[in-house]
Amino acid sequence: MKFADGFWLNQRGYEVNYANQAFEIEEIENGFLVVATPFVVYNRAMMLGSANLEIAYTSTQENCVKVSITHHKGHVDNGPHFVLEDKGFKPQVTVTDKEAVLVTGDTKLVVSKENWSFTYYYKDKKLTSGGWRSTGVIF
């Protein structure tokens, strides 16, 4: 679906909010949770009424990273539901003031706190990355 009109304009009727800052990063089971905001936030009050995204990066198997992006959690869960194999794998998670790192086998994910960017590595070789306008929500 085309929602952009050229490179910098949006089509009429669409409001697009891109992640611009990793405001908060919290370590969770098997990974970390990022609260991404569409603009630079200096305090929690600035987040009211904005299109904040919760992005969970987790890993339950070696060299596999699961990414879940949520804008609104309130919904009826009608499935489908599948039983996933859990081998008890625990990735290495490091959260610092500047970045969060998830290491699962030979795969590494680095999320920057200063501006919105994430990079995937495999055996210390850069696979792919995302930054400005890579993650967002469309109304």
What are these regions (language model features)?
Residues 1-139:
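N-terminal accessory segment at the very beginning of proteins
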